[in-house]
Amino acid sequence: MTDMYASLRSNVSMLGQILGDTMRTHLGDSFLEKVEQIRKLAKDSRRGDEAAREQMLELLTALPDEELVPFAKAFNQFLNLANLSEQFHTISRNCDELVCVPDPVEQLLGRMLNGRVDQTKMLDCLKTLDIDLVLTAHPTEISRRTLIQKYAAIVDCLAEQENNQLSDRERQQINLRLRQLIAQIWHTNEIRRERPTPVDEARWGLSTIEESLWHAVPDFLRQLNDQVQERTGQQLPIDIAPVRFSSWMGGDRDGNPFVTAKVTQEVLDRNRHAAARLFLKDIVLLVGELSMEEANDELKAYTNNSCEPYRFVLRSLRQKLRDTIDYLNARIEGHNPEVDKSTLIWQESDLKAPLEMLYKSLYDCGMRLIANGLLLDILRRLACFGIHMLRLDIRQDAGRHCDVLAELTRYLGMGDFNHWDETEKQAFLLRELSNRRPLIPSNWQPSADVAEVLNTCRLIAKHPAKALGSYVISMASKPSDVLTVLLLLKETGCTHPMRVVPLFETLSDLNNAAACITDLLDIDWYRGYTKGMQEVMIGYSDSAKDAGVMAAAWAQYRAQEQLVAVCNQAGVKLTLFHGRGGSIGRGGGPAHKAILSQPPGSVDGRIRVTEQGEMIRFKFGLPKLAVQSLALYTSAVLEATLLPPPEPKQEWRNCMERIAEESVSAYRGIVREEPDFVAYFRAATPEVELGKLPLGSRPAKRRVDGGIESLRAIPWIFAWSQNRLMLPAWLGAGEALQAACQRGEIGLLQDMEREWPFFSTRISMLEMVYAKAEPNLARYYETCLVSTNLHHLGETLRQRLDLGIKVVLELTKSDTLMAHTPWNRESVKLRNPYIDPLNFLQTELLARTRKETSETPASEHVQLALMLTIAGVAAGMRNTG
């Protein structure tokens, strides 16, 4: 890398050297020399040295079984350490301005208050921002929690090293700690022995809050308050919470038979337990701080003139939190203890009201400096996390709800709900929703699958609304899908209005989304239920798998526009829930750009966005990184609300319509219509092997016997990222853009790229994917793993990749990809020589594994090394799915 990244390069080199010393200590000089030799050959190969490439391949294929695992581990861990160094560089004192952009909130406030936005309007919008980041488990999340914690400790050491006042002894101690941590990592098994359970995944999500977000949220709000006060002279409210957090971990049962009502109950208890435990730590610290005696009349009266009135209140809260933890421990262990709710923190006001009373007393008595310390941080944590820590969404497939009613209507002799048309379904559902008598007979014994759906609904009825988020209906397509869930909730005793959210996922469902919501809002009963609020989820993963990224992106954009128009006409506030993944092929990419590229009027101060597995770690895994991410989200939503992008010109729309039509045709022409595609996909990628890895709790397929259509979007992306072709993230796009150029529309495309955030974001995402794609490596996989009669398909795919790259370079008037984002380009270049050997080794291991028989199974060394190469490539690509 260039000199502008000197501090980053220094950290990468230092950590790499320590890793090398660790390997030398435990495996000897000869092993380390072989690793270094292969690394240097990989670099030479990257420069076009064919002899170096051949020599590297000879060394890799000749590795004895006992060296497979340590070799894969060596390159895997180097890539993880490089990732750490990059993460740290973005929050480092030595961060270069090309990497670390100025604070986005500070920049935005300057632009807004420079005559573009009324100050009062800006403050009102900021105070009411409603950004909900929904943490979701990731079926291909690679890193184990124990390693993530060690990586965080390494970052702490890197931060300590930046202190110029350290003595030589202190620097030696930090270096020793780094050596200890890297040795611990080297001797820790990187691959889980067993799949994580849904509860394990939920605990992983809670650990992110405890280790990072719990600290980051008040830090971010303090920073935001200072910025606003400096610009406007006004303070933000003490209970401001522009960003909150929800979760799908333990609530998402779509296609996951392991997420049961019992599991969801345990996760709800664990969420509340984690919150009580963290608030207890805070209250214990606050008892030590608030030792003063002076108080206002309200606090004096409340504490009977105690000489330590603040501690009097805090000690009571401390005991209530301890009792709450004991109660929740008993529940988690399977007991159902009888309790006096008044002795516990049972609702948010039990904690909020006493703390606000203390805050007001300190304020009234002139101790504002003290009030705005730890006490304010606790109040803001409470506003953000509540006493339930995360609001748990429930997600289930629309068909499962219909099956409940189908079984019930058959039992009642009414026919089969699944065989009724939409008009008949709606008439029945609305009649029963308005009927006070129960529909479900007390003596009915449903099947196990139906009972599970009903048990989940009963669980929802038992819990307070603040513990839960939305009930998301996957594969929704009709108004009856929503009404069915509402009826099931009614019949199971749910009295609080839960948000029931249709998720439109396929291309056809996205195109029909506005019509579906129009029909719903035309129903008087439903309008009354919504109380003027409607949430709709837009699916990115499955729509891209269904139609390709370009057609899916345009369908998502149009669906949002139409939904905004429908809800505006009905006088209903719309919240759009974006089901984005981490990868480009699943709607991922920089969140700031993504939000600013949404249709004008579609954000309006409110947004929900999924944050998945590996992206949670990259964005929120360190407190300072989390502060940056919270600032990016806040500034983007504020800007999209108050300074929305212009409406796209009609000629741009017409062009996108043509591009979408041509791209979906090109995409489906391969994925659906090419008879050899499935066979090629399964041979040229580790898709089959991925299904055997103990990575996530959810099965990789919806149906065991299905083809591409049954494969979940995440492993679909993951498999193609392993062989470096990255196909789902670009297939169809290049062909459509080339067709536009051939129509003489290159100038129009360049105007769109320059002036339309939606289109420019799509092009920049394509650039990033094209830069990561490695057709020569994909060809090597093909040569080693795919039958020669299928090679023609690989050649076609690589030609299409090359076509896409050329047309994007022409469109952007660039000689190289990512010319305008040198940091990203350098990052890709840094990793390639370390990922390449893992790819070549993975190919060899796949070939060995696929030759195994019951008489000659692949050795344990081969199987574990294969898993490590998959983990290493994922770390290097920073892209699982």
From Swiss-Prot:
Reactions mediated catalytically: oxaloacetate + phosphate = phosphoenolpyruvate + hydrogencarbonate
Superkingdom, natural source: Bacteria
Record-annotated active site: 138, 545
Gene3D superfamilies given in the database record: Phosphoenolpyruvate/pyruvate domain
GO cellular component terms given for this protein: cytosol
A Gene Ontology BP annotation from the UniProt entry: tricarboxylic acid cycle
Entry EC number(s): 4.1.1.31
Membrane-spanning residues: none
Xref: InterPro entries: PEP_COase, PEP_COase_bac/pln-type, PEP_COase_Lys_AS, PEPCASE_His_AS, Pyrv/PenolPyrv_kinase-like_dom
Gene Ontology MF: a single term: phosphoenolpyruvate carboxylase activity
Cofactor: Mg(2+)
Keyword entries, A-Z: Carbon dioxide fixation, Lyase, Magnesium
PANTHER family (alphabetical): PHOSPHOENOLPYRUVATE CARBOXYLASE
UniProt similarity note: Belongs to the PEPCase type 1 family.
Protein name: Phosphoenolpyruvate carboxylase
Source organism: Shewanella oneidensis (strain ATCC 700550 / JCM 31522 / CIP 106686 / LMG 19005 / NCIMB 14063 / MR-1)
